[in-house]
């Protein structure tokens, strides 16, 4: 097998013509396919960038909403703790006031009862003394002593 280097005898010219025609026809066809593919890829990239930008904006908004919600939750927690402390303090003060009122009422009741008992004892002592004096008076008071008592009482009444 020998190589034939004679261009006229070979199909080089034919090959060049066929290759030229193929390149000329396929350039439009393959170029269109490649151009459409390039446009589709560029469009997908633009869509991805748009979605990324939208997602970034939504993430930023969600993060700011989360921060605001956390601040609101912290404020609610602090307000709740303050309110619970105020309610607890108010309850303690009411309990102390109620206990003081009960104690004061008990002391007043005890004082009133003591005063009532003192009055009863005074009356009973006075009645007992009067009864004793009335029982002892006739034996101790003779006519002469009775006259002196009456005179001294009249003198005391005149001086008064």
Swiss-Prot record:
Localization in the cell: Cellular thylakoid membrane
Gene Ontology molecular function terms on file: proton-transporting ATP synthase activity, rotational mechanism
Membrane-spanning ranges: 13-33
GO cellular component: plasma membrane-derived thylakoid membrane; proton-transporting ATP synthase complex
Assembly information from the UniProt record: F-type ATPases have 2 components, F(1) - the catalytic core - and F(0) - the membrane proton channel. F(1) has five subunits: alpha(3), beta(3), gamma(1), delta(1), epsilon(1). F(0) has four main subunits: a(1), b(1), b'(1) and c(10-14). The alpha and beta chains form an alternating ring which encloses part of the gamma chain. F(1) is attached to F(0) by a central stalk formed by the gamma and epsilon chains, while a peripheral stalk is formed by the delta, b and b' chains.
InterPro entries: ATP_synth_b/b'su_bac/chlpt (IPR002146)
UniProt keyword terms in alphabetical order: ATP synthesis, CF(0), Hydrogen ion transport, Ion transport, Membrane, Thylakoid, Transmembrane, Transmembrane helix, Transport
Lineage: Bacteria, Bacillati, Cyanobacteriota, Cyanophyceae, Synechococcales
Family: Belongs to the ATPase B chain family.
Name listed for the protein in its UniProt record: ATP synthase subunit b
Membrane topology: Single-pass membrane protein
Organism: Parasynechococcus marenigrum (strain WH8102)
Functional summary from the UniProt entry: F(1)F(0) ATP synthase produces ATP from ADP in the presence of a proton or sodium gradient. F-type ATPases consist of two structural domains, F(1) containing the extramembraneous catalytic core and F(0) containing the membrane proton channel, linked together by a central stalk and a peripheral stalk. During catalysis, ATP synthesis in the catalytic domain of F(1) is coupled via a rotary mechanism of the central stalk subunits to proton translocation.
């Amino acid at each position: 097998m020998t190589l034939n280097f004679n261009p006229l005898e070979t199909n080089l010219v034919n090959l060049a013509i066929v290759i030229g025609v193929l390149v000329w026809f396929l350039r439009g066809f393959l170029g269109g396919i490649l151009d459409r593919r390039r446009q589709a890829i560029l469009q997908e990239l633009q869509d991805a960038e748009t979605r990324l930008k939208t997602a970034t904006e939504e993430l930023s908004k969600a993060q700011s909403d989360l921060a605001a919600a956390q601040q609101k939750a912290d404020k609610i927690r602090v307000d709740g703790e303050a309110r619970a402390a105020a309610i607890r303090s108010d309850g303690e003060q009411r309990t102390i006031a109620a206990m003081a009122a009960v104690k004061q009422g008990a002391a007043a009741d005890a004082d009133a009862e003591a005063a009532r008992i003192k009055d009863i004892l005074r009356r009973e002592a006075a009645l007992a003394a009067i009864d004793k004096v009335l029982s002892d008076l006739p034996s101790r008071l003779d006519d002469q002593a009775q006259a002196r008592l009456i005179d001294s009482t009249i003198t005391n009444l005149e001086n008064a």
